[in-house]
């Protein structure tokens, strides 16, 4: 499968937490979220379909649907959550989410018909959908969502989890196409530790705790100079460059730093993981700019750094305690009301939603993976 290739006031307010001398007024994390509202207006149709306009097929993906579910939950919008979930179930799961994992790609085919374009699965989208369902069930007291989240975890266990020799239980990127003659292709960005922790809590007899521990090894050993690759291949003993894609870290790998930066301080894997992924921070400290594409074996980049990548690095730089670097990257990301923000493509907008939203304290992850949305805090509850 091939896949894919805001904010000054809000983000700088988050930066102020690391910059005590900065005279920056913090906006209320309880108030309207302009960046999310703009995303909804542009990318989410009334029926709940999330559209990526960058591609001619005007595609929708399980990833896009999963992120929309997550941010609808962060924004406490049950109506939108229900619409996005309904579209996902009917169009990606064939109307039977209890039996079918969602197809990863839906859009317009060459004849102009709208349909599933690739029935293979993508475990990153499914993991986030399961997470959103579990947390929506808990936070909104909707037991049907808890059951649906459990059902999806069971489907993922059955179809996308394998025990790799020399490594142990691992989440494969999808149902088919990632195992070839004793070699397993993995995507490090599909392994957010906090999401796996929540899965382990919801399914304690499942493989999720082991996958989380093994994921730390994937992230460490596939990043020999501190840069995560988009894809890596395990041969039973070592991690190797993907033969088709090479040692490249780009639009997938940027999320590895994002997920690591958002880990709770109580996560036992956090400190070592941030150390293992020091590449982008080291480049910035050397007054160099991380690039669009990084040769992960040499730490050498090509292409201008996309704005969304800067947004994704915000939690990471915050976690590393790098206030000057954090401020510099925050200043690259346009405010939600600026034309430059409106011009950002779908994927960069999602990175900005994750990075900016976290820095603005609109949500956090607990050490056990639970979502801690701002709207559940006493301060926000008092404003409603």
UniProtKB/Swiss-Prot annotation:
Organism: Xanthomonas axonopodis pv. citri (strain 306)
Active site, renumbered: 63, 124
Entry keyword DNA damage: no
Enzyme Commission number(s): 3.2.1.4
Name listed for the protein in its UniProt record: Endoglucanase
An MF annotation (GO) of this entry: cellulase activity
Record keyword Secreted present: yes
Main location: secreted
GO BP: cellulose catabolic process
Annotated Gene Ontology cellular component terms: extracellular region
Keywords: Carbohydrate metabolism, Cellulose degradation, Glycosidase, Hydrolase, Polysaccharide degradation, Secreted, Signal
Role description: Hydrolyzes carboxymethylcellulose.
Catalytic activity from the UniProt record: Endohydrolysis of (1->4)-beta-D-glucosidic linkages in cellulose, lichenin and cereal beta-D-glucans
Position of the signal peptide: 1-25
Superkingdom per UniProt: Bacteria
Subcellular location: Secreted
InterPro entries: 6-hairpin_glycosidase_sf, 6hp_glycosidase-like_sf, Glyco_hydro_8
Pathway: Glycan metabolism; bacterial cellulose biosynthesis
Stated family: Belongs to the glycosyl hydrolase 8 (cellulase D) family.
Classification via Pfam families: Glyco_hydro_8 (PF01270)
């Amino acid at each position: 499968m091939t896949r894919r290739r805001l904010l000054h006031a809000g983000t700088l307010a988050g930066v102020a937490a690391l910059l005590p001398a900065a005279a920056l007024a913090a906006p209320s994390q309880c108030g309207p979220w302009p960046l999310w509202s703009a995303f909804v207006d542009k990318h989410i149709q009334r029926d709940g379909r999330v559209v990526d306009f960058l591609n001619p097929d005007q595609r929708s993906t399980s990833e896009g649907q999963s992120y929309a579910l997550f941010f609808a939950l962060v924004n406490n919008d049950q109506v939108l959550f229900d619409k996005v979930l309904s579209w996902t179930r009917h169009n990606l799961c064939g109307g039977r989410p209890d039996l079918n994992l969602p197809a990863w790609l839906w859009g317009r085919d060459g004849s102009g018909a709208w349909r599933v374009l690739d029935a293979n699965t993508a475990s990153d989208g499914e993991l986030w959908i399961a997470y959103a369902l579990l947390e929506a069930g808990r936070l909104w007291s909707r037991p049907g969502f808890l059951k649906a989240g459990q059902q999806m975890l069971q489907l993922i266990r059955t179809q996308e989890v394998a025990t790799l020799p020399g490594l142990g239980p691992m989440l494969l990127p999808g149902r088919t196409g990632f195992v070839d003659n004793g070699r397993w292709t993995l995507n490090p960005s599909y392994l957010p530790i906090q999401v796996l922790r929540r899965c382990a809590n919801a399914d304690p007899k499942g493989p999720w705790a082991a996958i989380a521990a093994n994921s730390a090894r994937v992230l460490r050993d596939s990043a020999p100079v501190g840069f995560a690759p988009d894809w890596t291949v395990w041969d039973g003993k070592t991690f190797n460059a993907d033969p088709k894609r090479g040692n490249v870290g780009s639009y997938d790998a940027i999320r590895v730093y994002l997920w690591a930066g958002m880990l709770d301080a109580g996560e036992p894997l956090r400190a070592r993981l941030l150390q293992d992924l020091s590449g982008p921070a080291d480049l910035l400290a050397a007054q160099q700019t991380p690039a669009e594409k990084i040769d992960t074996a040499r730490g050498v980049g090509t292409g201008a750094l996309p704005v969304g990548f800067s947004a994704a690095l915000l939690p990471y730089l915050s976690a590393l305690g790098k206030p000057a670097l954090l401020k510099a990257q925050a200043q690259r990301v346009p405010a939600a009301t600026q034309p430059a923000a409106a011009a950002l493509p779908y994927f960069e907008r999602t990175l900005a939603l994750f990075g900016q939203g976290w820095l603005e304290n609109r949500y956090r992850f607990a050490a056990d993976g639970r979502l801690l949305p701002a709207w559940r805090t006493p301060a926000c509850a008092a404003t409603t």
